[in-house]
């Protein structure tokens, strides 16, 4: 482990000294028997007061003489002789406390002068406006509710280190308004989605997180062991097969918002634990799904941000416009127009081109890959990152879509789409395969690929086949990456910015 630099060591020493001093103050509070009281109830919140009385002048507030009780974290303190000020932040926003010994008493005022930034404080008093126009609480009672032992980051620089922001998200939330705004927008977006689904007669359900057989996606699972049953189990990579069992059971419209787990790499777009919404609707197909998904995402933006026009990484994006639709080869030729139809149908050319682009075509997934899989790989190298505006890529090859219904008109193609925005996949949906014999054959093909070394190939799920044998109506199903959608709505460049506690290496 590398030794800390001199500046780092100095900062650590200073912080240790501050913590020691604050612990001394806490000991004094314990001796007085008032260290951590729990008998204060706020009557108002900062943001509500700021909003309701934004236009009230000093005279109007004095005439109203509104009694308030407010609590929060002390973010700023100015001691000025016989009158002092504190900026206090609660869960909604900030408001100023005005403190004088005449109002709170000399003993409380002297104690207040020793309180530290970060302390949780509470006040009762009257709402008024200072001579400088600041809405404030003129405190008649002031209390310390919880002592902060660690100092907050410098108010001018905040948390400069990105990893520290992720590792100590609690501090990031205290000092970074933008972080708090991101997660409030996330909550609004998810609430919007739930309402949208409910209004469309979908039923929210919960399906298992521990699976005896991983399925529903091409991914490497986390493996665990169930001691009581003495059996190997897997954290779910997708809820798909369980949700479709519910369609078989007669619930014609279902959805689930929950976590998936995939034992794969970490990147700006990937976290091993992530949130997805999957939904399934009987008597629909992938065309219906595209229209529905487009409306859902547009509404989530409006409810979370107040508009369907957003800015992402400096570029404007209008989600109110109709989303584009392209096939895989159309997308390739749009962004790499030198490729001819003949080249895109030539196995040897595609393999050579992928190799030229740095793709290892000797991987197990490529050993028996057909034209469709090779075209998809070329699309990922040449076109995917260029799909800035919302674009449905449609008609995926059957060999990479083992759960999707085959097209009635084009052999080897499925009724499947993926939605890309700002070069990232946001959603994946298709007309569901409901033919049990076809599904069993595709599972067997996946097992062959797994035996050949493809760790992401699917297992054979005999119980799911049994469910299909009872008859599943024609169905459309879609999965939407909630984290990536929130990245888009909050102008966040990495998935870690929209996860409260993203996975990091252990802190040694």
Swiss-Prot record:
Cofactor: Mg(2+)
Catalysis: reaction(s): tRNA(Lys) + L-lysine + ATP = L-lysyl-tRNA(Lys) + AMP + diphosphate
GO molecular function, one term: tRNA binding
CDD domains, A to Z: LysRS_core, LysRS_N
Keywords: Aminoacyl-tRNA synthetase, ATP-binding, Cytoplasm, Ligase, Magnesium, Metal-binding, Nucleotide-binding, Protein biosynthesis
Binding site for Mg(2+) 2: 425
GO biological process assignments: lysyl-tRNA aminoacylation
Pfam families: tRNA-synt_2, tRNA_anti-codon
EC number: 6.1.1.6
Annotated binding of Mg(2+) 1, by residue: 418, 425
InterPro entries documented for this protein: Aa-tRNA-synt_II, aa-tRNA-synth_II, aa-tRNA-synth_II/BPL/LPL, Lys-tRNA-ligase_II, Lys-tRNA-ligase_II_N, Lys-tRNA-synth_II_C, NA-bd_OB-fold, NA-bd_OB_tRNA
Signal sequence extent: none
Main location: cytoplasm
Subunit structure, interactors included: Homodimer.
Record-linked NCBIfam families: lysS_bact, PRK00484.1
PANTHER family per UniProt: LYSINE--TRNA LIGASE, CHLOROPLASTIC_MITOCHONDRIAL, LYSYL-TRNA SYNTHETASE
Protein name stated in the entry: Lysine--tRNA ligase
């Amino acid at each position: 482990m590398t030794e800390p630099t001199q500046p780092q060591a100095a900062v650590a020493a200073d912080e240790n000294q501050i913590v020691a001093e604050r612990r001394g103050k806490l000991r004094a509070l314990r001796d007085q028997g008032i260290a951590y009281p729990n008998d204060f109830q706020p009557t108002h919140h900062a943001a509500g007061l700021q909003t309701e009385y934004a236009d009230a002048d000093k005279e109007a507030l004095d005439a109203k003489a509104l009694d308030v009780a407010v609590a929060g974290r002390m973010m700023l303190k100015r001691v000025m002789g016989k009158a002092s000020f504190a900026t206090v932040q609660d869960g909604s926003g900030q408001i100023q406390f005005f403190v004088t010994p005449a109002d709170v008493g000399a003993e409380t005022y002297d104690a207040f002068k020793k309180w530290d930034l970060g302390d949780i404080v509470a006040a009762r008093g009257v709402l008024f406006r200072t001579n400088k126009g600041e809405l404030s609480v003129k405190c008649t009672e002031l209390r310390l509710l919880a002592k902060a032992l660690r100092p907050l980051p410098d108010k001018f620089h905040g948390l400069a280190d990105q990893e520290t922001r992720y590792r100590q998200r609690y501090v990031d939330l205290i000092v970074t308004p933008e972080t708090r705004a991101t997660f409030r927008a996330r909550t609004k977006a998810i609430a919007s989605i739930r309402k949208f689904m409910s209004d469309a007669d979908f039923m929210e359900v919960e399906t298992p997180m521990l699976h005896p057989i991983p399925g529903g996606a091409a991914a490497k699972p986390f493996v665990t062991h169930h001691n009581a049953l003495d059996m190997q189990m897997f954290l779910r990579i997708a809820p798909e097969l369980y949700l479709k069992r519910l369609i078989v059971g007669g619930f014609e419209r279902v959805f689930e918002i929950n976590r998936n787990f995939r034992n794969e790499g970490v990147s700006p777009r990937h976290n091993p634990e992530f949130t997805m919404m999957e939904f399934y609707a009987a008597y629909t197909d992938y065309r219906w799904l595209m229209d529905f998904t487009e409306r859902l995402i547009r509404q989530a933006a409006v409810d979370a941000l107040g508009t369907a026009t957003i800015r992402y990484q400096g570029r404007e994006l209008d989600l109110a416009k109709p989303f584009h639709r392209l096939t895989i080869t159309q997308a390739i030729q749009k962004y790499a127009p030198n490729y001819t139809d003949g080249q895109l149908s030539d196995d040897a050319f595609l393999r050579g081109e992928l190799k030229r682009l740095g793709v290892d075509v000797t991987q197990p997934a490529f050993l028996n890959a057909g034209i469709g899989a090779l075209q998809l790989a070329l699309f990922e190298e040449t076109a995917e990152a260029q799909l800035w505006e919302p674009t449905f890529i449609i008609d995926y090859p059957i060999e990479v879509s083992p759960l999707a219904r085959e097209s009635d008109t084009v052999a080897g193609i499925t009724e499947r789409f993926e939605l890309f925005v700002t070069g990232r996949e946001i959603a994946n949906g298709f007309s569901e395969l409901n033919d049990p014999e076809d599904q069993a054959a595709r599972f067997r093909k996946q097992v062959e690929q797994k035996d050949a070394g493809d760790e992401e190939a699917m297992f054979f799920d005999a119980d799911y086949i049994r469910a299909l044998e009872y008859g599943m109506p024609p169905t459309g199903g879609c999965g939407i990456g909630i984290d990536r959608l929130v990245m888009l709505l909050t102008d966040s460049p990495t998935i870690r910015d929209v996860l409260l506690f993203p996975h990091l290496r252990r802190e040694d």
